[in-house]
Structure formats: structure tokens, C-alpha cells
Amino acid sequence: MHSTRNKQLKKLKSWHKNKKAMPAVLASTLLMAAHAQAAETTGADTMIVSANAGESVTAPLKGIVAKESASGTKTSTPLIKTPQSVTVVTRDQMDAQAVSSVSDALNYSSGVVTNYRGSSNRNDEVIARGFRYAPKFLDGLSYGLSGQGSTIGKMNPWLLERVEMVHGPASVLYGQVNPGGLISMTSKRPTAETIRKVQFSAGNQHLGEAAFDFGGALNDDKTLLYRLDGIASTKHEFVKDSKQERIAVAPSLTWLPNPDTSFTLLTSYQNDPKAGYRNFLPKIGTVVEASAGYIPYDLNVSDPNYNQSKREQGSIGYNLDHSFNDVFSFQQNVRYTQLREKYKYLVYTKNADAPATDTTILRRPQKEENEISEFAIDNQLKATFATGSVNHTVLSGLDYKWLTLEKKMWLDRNNDYSFNWANPTYNVSVNDSMLTELSTNERNKLNQVGVYLQDQLEWNQWNLLLSGRHDWSRVDKQDYAADTTTERNDGKFTGRAGLLYAFDNGISPYVSYSTSFEPNLDSGAPGTPAFKPTTGEQKEVGVKFQPKGSNTLLTVSLFDITQKNITSYNSVTRYNEQIGKVKSKGVETEAHTQLTPEISLMAAYSYTDAVTKESYTASQVNKAPSSIPRHAASAWGSYSFHNGPLKGVTLGTGVRYIGSTYGDNAESFKVPAYTLFDAMARYELGSLASQLKGAAVQLNVNNLTDKHYVASCGGDTACFYGSGRTVVATVSYSW
């Protein structure tokens, strides 16, 4: 084993000089996996095989309180013993709150800003600890594109078992991650227990939705398991004459050839023939009242007859687990993903040379095409053993990914398509032949290899976490618009050290230090060379509290993060720019508790002080980046009646507060704070009649008071209204 691993490391080091070594590296890891499957051992069962080995981090979990997670350490570890802040959103929480996006799932989490583009959030964009575009990972591997200046891809939450937020740097295990944190998504997996569920929803905004979830064993000895999830939905957006339509399906299959081996095939396909629209609005008329008042809440800046938005994405991969014996186990995750997006619209633009009033919007036609192809593989060898009185969980890994991003954008800068938002006129004739300026036409390719080593040491009540990783990355940029080709090679070591002491009373104080590294695929103006990778570091102290035998977890953390080479989107030029260094420090508190069998509560508060410390634009230095609230808070509670005339009824309510934010990176204006209220009522119809067991009805109302507000601004030409009241009625049946 050691000689094989040494050969892999030698091949890895030579890759930076010769990429032809990569097939050999991958071949050797696949041979290791094949050997693992064929080996006959008597080790402990894998997570899927054994349902009694404790809480599974991939299987269904009842309630809103998770006690274990693998996202922070890549090993199933109790959260109370993890020296890092991790938020877990369970399937039950997502169902109770009727979330329609991964961003929605994190609405009640600390340290994150979700849906800051309001109803124009066409992708899952999340700000974490003051840093934009928290990257998304699906089943341990990167999914879609999440860089400092852009994000592409949107996963339907119905296909997921849980969504987790790892707060702070996680590059030491995952590689391409910014220091704010990452979003870890876990697919619904096959189970030996039979799952049969259908669900239908309807609501305002012409919502119509049908979903199903089936799973179970395909043979008598339960060595073949399956899961099949799917959803179809259609709804109108709050922007006039703009729609979202979606069909998504995720078949998966697990094979258990022996008690020590499991192989799970994971696939998904999603087609959004109408993928939504990003509705840029001016500051005048949204944040500041114009001469004619405020811009109507449902104003469509573009033209419904011209708009076009499509998204298609699919993936196929597998998870292989094998236990050699009581000490060694091996896991391999592999996935190939492809994603395509097409958009066409009239976008609000600012042109100082064109005549305008505070009610006139100047627009230009714009067309975008994005395509991502990504392959990722992660090989993990785990050893659990003791040296004297010290218990070790050692994880060594080798991962590789390549990602190709092709971007095209056509513009027509003549600005002939203007209208008065106080008296808008639509159905304009747009001449697509005038879209002759190919402002962006490029192909970016990332190759990244990483090796990592981690040791989780436990001695009495002390828990020490030590991790180290080295990455080699290459970014090739072919800029067809500027007729240039650039290549950038980088290598970086990242590390993490965390120390936690678990008191008998359930209090666990901890301290940690970690660094981050992220190759950059963001695009600047034509002719701009490949951006430098970002680097970051974080210092964190915190305390967790989980009373023995309780279903409660409370976390308080203080963090201090610095990131260099960060990029930002310029709302005037419509290009990304590498602005320099940002420092963010703050406090996060979060609590999840099943107080009694009837009462569940969650609450969160965060204070974030983010400041640009270095920038080529002098007016941005020592100023807060846009869209980041200093204060944010939320709370959700529910009560379930188990007896009496209201037996089967669950009532829930929540409140979300987002503090004021700056509207640009120079602090030239502010966007007011806002508070939103949510509510839920559910009735298990089996309490009414035994024949209705498994049937339920549920009503969810978000933004209960239908508050109209500005979610954020990214400049005086890039403001976004928030979503209005949404009402969703759901009927479900499980049998």
C-alpha cells in the first residue's frame, strides 16, 4: 500500500511539469479501488450497510438537529467535536419551510446572505462571512462554477437529503474554495427501507408543481438498492411576464456485493426551458424616490417578447466505499458534470452620453452563452487506530479535477431601446443582427491536482485536528475576442489546525487557524490576462454546547479572515476586476433544538465587518463591499400537536432580519434594512381517519406581510427588488 501511494505522489509532483502523467495517476487510483472491491476482509460495515452504527451523514434524518457531519473533515464526526462552525439543514427542515432553492435552504443559517438579488436570483448565489459566491459541492465534489465574480448552476433541493454550510476556509480538503466557506449538498441515496412519496403543490404566481420520491430494495437479500426522485414545476416570477419552468430527475443505484463494500451510482438531469431573468434596476426609483415615485415592483426592464433563458445540466458519477479491516478503509468519489446556459434580454445600462431623466431607462440587447464541462475524482484512504491512549483518525487523499468554461456575450451598444418606466411600452422590435460586438468570447480551462493529509487526534477530552494540503493548478485562457492566449501555473500549500476540549457538561470551546487557495476562472475585459488565484487565512475561536442526551446544538464563533486577489463585478463596465485585498471579521451564533417532542426551535445571529483594504480604485479602500449587512438575524419555531382535538397539526413561524447594506463598493449610498415573516401550517390526515395515513396537507407563506423592499444593490445601475409574498399549498402522500 505504501509503495503504491509513494508512486502516486511521485507522479503527482511530475504532473506540474508534464500533464501526460495524469492518466497514470488516475489509473493507479482506479486499480486501488478495484483491489479494494475484490479484497475479502472482516472489517466494520460501511455507512450505508450498517444502519445501527450511529447517525448517518447521507441517510434520512428525522428532525432539524443533526449531530454528525462529514463536510468539515471528510469523515463522519460529531459536530460537538469538530473545531469549526458547520450548519446542517436537514430534509425535514427543507420540507417544513417549503424551500425552492439551495439558497432558500440557508435562509435561517448564520453568517450567510441568501437571495440578495431578490426575485432576480437566477443562480444559487450566497455570501458567506462577507465573501461572495460560496462554492457549491455535491457529494463531496465541486459542482458548477462558483468564483469570486460569478456563479453558474442551480440544483433543485427536492433531489437533496441535506444542505450544509461549512463556515470559513475548507481548501485544505477541497482545494478550490474561497475563505468564506462552502455549501455542501448531499444527494438522496438508495435505502434498504421502502420509500414511496408523491407530492403536489400550487400557489400564487401561477405555481404548479408535482414531485415524487421512490426507493428501496430490488432483491430479497437487499444487495441492490435504488432511489428515484423527480420534480416538474412552473411558476411566474414577481417580474412581469417572466417565468421559471423546470424538470429534474435523479436516479441512483447501490450495489452491496459483500458486507464491507458498497458502490453507488449517482446521476441527475435538470432542464429549465425558462430559467428566470436578472432584472437590473437603477438606484433612482428603488432606493431613492424618483420624480414619478418608485418603480413598480413587477417592472420588467427587458421585453417579454425578446427575453429568452434556458439552462440544462446533467451529471453522472459514483461513490465506492470499502473496508479492508478494522483499521483501513477506502473511498472514491467520481463525477462528470455538464451545464449549458443561454440568455437573451434587454439589460439596463448607464450611458453618460445619452439623454435620460430619472424615469427613463436606457437598455441594450445582450445575449449570453455559457457552457461548463467538469470531471472530478477524489480518492481517500482512512485509518483508525490508537497510539497508547491517543485515538487517531488519519485521512490521506489525492484528488484531481479539470473544468472547461466557455463564455460568449454579444452586445449592441446603440442604446436605442429606451423606455419610460412610469409609462412602459413593450413589444419593441429588436434587430438581432445588430448584436455584432462579441464582447466576451473565451475558453478557460482549469487543471488542478491536490494531495492532502489529516489527523484527528482524541486524547481524553482533547480533540486536535491537523490538516495539510498541496495544490498544483494550471489555468489556460483562450481569449478569442482579443486573439490572445495566456497560461498561468500556480502551486500552494494550505493548512489547518484546530483544538477543542469537550467538557462533561456538553460545553466544547475550540480555536482554529486555516488558510485557503482558489484558482480563478473569472473573466475580465477582453485582453485581460488570467487572474491570479486568491489566497486567504482565518483565525477562529468559538464554543459549542450540546447537553448530554439532548437534541440541541448551540454554536458561537468569532472569526477574522483576510483574502487577497479578490475579484469584484463592475456594474458599469459589466466585467469582473481584481480589486486587491478584503478583510472580514465578525461573530456568528446559531442554535438548533428539539426542545420537546412537540417544540422545535432554531435561531441565528451574525455580525460581519467586511472592509476592502487594497484596491486599484482609491475610493474603495477602507470601505465595505456592497450587499453585505453588518447585522443579520433569524428565528424559526414550530409546535406539533400529538394529542387532543388538534392531533396531527403542526404550526410554524419565522422571522428574518437583514440589516442595511452599502449599495456600492465606495459606500456612496445605503440600502435600507428589512424584516420578513414566514408561516407554516401542516395537518397529518391520518389523525382524521386511519384510511388517510401517510397523507398530509401543508400551507406555507413567505414574506407574510408582502413587504416591498430592495434586496441589495451592486452599484447605482444594479439594484434588485426582493421577492413578494409567496403562498404554497401542498398535498403529499407516503405509503
From Swiss-Prot:
Motif TonB box: positions: 45-52
TBDR plug domain mapped to chain residues: 78-188
Gene source species: Dickeya dadantii (strain 3937)
Top-level taxonomy: Bacteria, Pseudomonadati, Pseudomonadota, Gammaproteobacteria, Enterobacterales
GO molecular function list: siderophore uptake transmembrane transporter activity; signaling receptor activity
Main localisation: membrane
Family recorded in the similarity comment: Belongs to the TonB-dependent receptor family.
Protein name: Ferrichrysobactin receptor
Periplasmic side: 39-45, 92-107, 133-168, 188-193, 231-260, 295-311, 337-342, 387-391, 412-423, 457-460, 504-508, 547-551, 577-598, 658-673, 705-706
GO CC annotation: cell outer membrane
Function noted in UniProt: Involved in the initial step of iron uptake by binding chrysobactin, an iron chelatin siderophore that allows the bacteria to extract iron from the environment.
Subcellular localization: Cell outer membrane
Domain TBDR beta-barrel: 193-735
PROSITE patterns, A to Z: TONB_DEPENDENT_REC_1 (PS00430), TONB_DEPENDENT_REC_3 (PS52016)
One Pfam family of this chain: Plug
